[in-house]
């Protein structure tokens, strides 16, 4: 593996075009998780992803997985579920609980990349109005949700969780619809998986992704994080 740039206390990143092809998108190492550095990273198509026993690793894969509202696919069975499930939704009511639930062991793995330092970093971003969560409720129980960053007219999804069937899908679909209603242009999904692709996510080149960010993350854009759509309206 070629030597990677090591970040110091100065606030900078290498250009994403210098990222490795294998492993896809690995760009640089080190630095910190200060809110200013994290925001700069996302604005430039870069995100941190590392395990507890690793230094901070920064990534910008090519291609990039995104979803736009016009590509959102909701199956008939999912529409019925959303109409009749009895689930309710909120924004930013329990951000820390959502991140902790995303970090919990899954049925297929006990590993997590959401370390204690990552939890603190994204909680700091939440406190300054950059990171947000959507919560899915079954009465008073938190059964699903996801979190990410909102910068300009782009939302950068980080992780989702589900404690009952379809709860994470419901969170994702509701978020995509609400972001569209607010005027967002796209959601960054980072890397593809079957779950996201089944909902309409697609892959675009890193070059195209960066050209979109260059315009959209600089948009002067703010709004209250309050539900304005009917999440059961299908």
From Swiss-Prot:
Gene Ontology CC terms, in alphabetical order: cytoplasm
Keyword Transferase: yes
Catalytic activity: N-terminal L-lysyl-[protein] + L-leucyl-tRNA(Leu) = N-terminal L-leucyl-L-lysyl-[protein] + tRNA(Leu) + H(+); N-terminal L-arginyl-[protein] + L-leucyl-tRNA(Leu) = N-terminal L-leucyl-L-arginyl-[protein] + tRNA(Leu) + H(+); L-phenylalanyl-tRNA(Phe) + an N-terminal L-alpha-aminoacyl-[protein] = an N-terminal L-phenylalanyl-L-alpha-aminoacyl-[protein] + tRNA(Phe)
Name of this chain's protein: Leucyl/phenylalanyl-tRNA--protein transferase
HAMAP family, per the entry: Leu_Phe_trans
Single biological process term from Gene Ontology: protein catabolic process
Enzyme class per UniProt: transferase
GO MF, one example: leucyl-tRNA--protein transferase activity
Key words of the record: Acyltransferase, Cytoplasm, Transferase
Gene: aat
The organism of origin for this protein: Hahella chejuensis (strain KCTC 2396)
Family label: Belongs to the L/F-transferase family.
EC number: 2.3.2.6
Highest taxon in the source lineage: Bacteria
Entry function: Functions in the N-end rule pathway of protein degradation where it conjugates Leu, Phe and, less efficiently, Met from aminoacyl-tRNAs to the N-termini of proteins containing an N-terminal arginine or lysine.
Compartments, as annotated in UniProt: Cytoplasm
């Amino acid at each position: 593996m070629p030597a990677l740039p090591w970040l110091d206390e100065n606030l900078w990143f290498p250009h994403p075009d210098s990222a490795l092809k294998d492993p896809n998108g690995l760009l640089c190492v080190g630095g910190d998780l200060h809110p200013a550095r994290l925001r700069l990273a996302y604005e430039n198509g870069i995100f941190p992803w590392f395990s507890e026993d690793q230094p901070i690793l920064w990534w910008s894969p090519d291609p990039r997985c995104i979803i736009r509202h016009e590509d959102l696919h909701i199956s008939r069975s999912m529409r019925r579920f959303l109409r009749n499930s009895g689930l309710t939704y909120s924004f930013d009511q329990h951000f820390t609980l959502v991140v902790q639930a995303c970090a919990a062991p899954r049925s297929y793995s006990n590993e997590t990349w959401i370390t204690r330092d990552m939890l603190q970093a994204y909680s700091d971003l939440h406190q300054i109005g950059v990171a947000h969560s959507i919560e899915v409720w079954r009465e008073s129980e938190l059964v699903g949700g996801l979190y990410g960053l909102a910068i300009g007219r782009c939302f950068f999804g980080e992780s989702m969780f589900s404690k009952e069937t379809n709860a994470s899908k419901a969170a994702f679909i509701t978020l995509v619809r609400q972001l569209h209603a607010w005027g967002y242009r796209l959601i960054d999904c980072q890397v593809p998986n079957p779950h996201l692709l089944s909902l309409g996510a697609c892959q675009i080149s890193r070059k195209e992704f960066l050209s979109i960010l260059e315009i959209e993350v600089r948009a002067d854009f703010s709004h209250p994080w309050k539900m304005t759509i009917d999440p059961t309206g299908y």
